[in-house]
Amino acid sequence: MSTVQVPKLNTKDLLTLEELTQEEIISLIEFAIYLKKNKQEPLLQGKILGLIFDKHSTRTRVSFEAGMVQLGGHGMFLNGKEMQMGRGETVSDTAKVLSHYIDGIMIRTFSHADVEELAKESSIPVINGLTDDHHPCQALADLMTIYEETNTFKGIKLAYVGDGNNVCHSLLLASAKVGMHMTVATPVGYKPNEEIVKKALAIAKETGAEIEILHNPELAVNEADFIYTDVWMSMGQEGEEEKYTLFQPYQINKELVKHAKQTYHFLHCLPAHREEEVTGEIIDGPQSIVFEQAGNRLHAQKALLVSLFKNVEELS
């Protein structure tokens, strides 16, 4: 640990990227890159992270569990439906009880308000592993992936095409925080949440970022350095079949990417549905970096875990 310091964060929890400063985000990314090169750093020896899941997961569960093992700690899987919370115990009571047993909580659930209450009522760090509104851990890994390719955020254009969902929300806040240019193109009726857009625009005024919300995908990806998409059907929306027709012009394919820079990179938070939001030709092509991006979930989250746990130790 002689080359990189553990970032000092002015927060107990990470619920959205709004809680972090630009300097804290950059420090986390640099620390994550260090941990990527030094996987077995026992910085959380003996620590226990509770992992509460109300939604299915591959990347979030495996990356957090593997991350805790590599850091010398332990990740404890907790099925939300099998906990007493699933039978009516309050979020507040659950938070207070878990604070006596474990050292931190990661929760992947539906309601963002529940995550906020869990953080408020617990004395240990709480990390948002995904809600219907935000996905900050994914956005941290996305920023790390972009930074590894460019070594800067200034002058970089990220184009997000598709549904203005939780991933889009976190990317808007992330881009605004680091001063990046982000365009979003969605069908009418599927724009990102207006309040979150307002927050991103307010942050952008301070950092020099540029945020644009559009409906034209060609305009959004014009001269883009990175093109990003997500599934058209998020968890819980599987019945909305009419979305397929509406979203078809927003598919990432060889015709659309012609508008981007020739050196563009393709990003996707995964899982992907080939031939829906993206063609196999693009996601499996030479300019796709989706698996490196997925791998960075592990390293970005390890950096976050160490920083939050160490921060709580210093405050206690």
Curated annotation (Swiss-Prot):
InterPro entries, per database record: Asp/Orn_carbamoyltranf_P-bd (IPR006132), Asp/Orn_carbamoylTrfase (IPR006130), Asp/Orn_carbamoylTrfase_sf (IPR036901), Asp_carbamoyltransf_Asp/Orn-bd (IPR006131), Orn/put_carbamltrans (IPR002292), OTCase_ArgI (IPR024904)
Residues holding L-ornithine: N166, D230, S234, M235
Family annotation (PROSITE patterns): CARBAMOYLTRANSFERASE (PS00097)
Intracellular or extracellular location(s): Cytoplasm
Metabolic or biological pathway, per its Swiss-Prot or TrEMBL entry: Amino-acid biosynthesis; L-arginine biosynthesis; L-arginine from L-ornithine and carbamoyl phosphate: step 1/3
Catalytic activity: carbamoyl phosphate + L-ornithine = L-citrulline + phosphate + H(+)
Binding site for carbamoyl phosphate: S57, T58, R59, T60, Q84, R108, H135, P136, C137, Q138, C269, L270, R297
A cellular-component GO term for this protein: cytoplasm
GO MF entries: amino acid binding; ornithine carbamoyltransferase activity
Assembly, per entry: Homotrimer.
Family statement: Belongs to the aspartate/ornithine carbamoyltransferase superfamily. OTCase family.
Role description: Reversibly catalyzes the transfer of the carbamoyl group from carbamoyl phosphate (CP) to the N(epsilon) atom of ornithine (ORN) to produce L-citrulline.
HAMAP family: OTCase (MF_01109)
Name of the molecule in the record: Ornithine carbamoyltransferase
Record gene name: argF
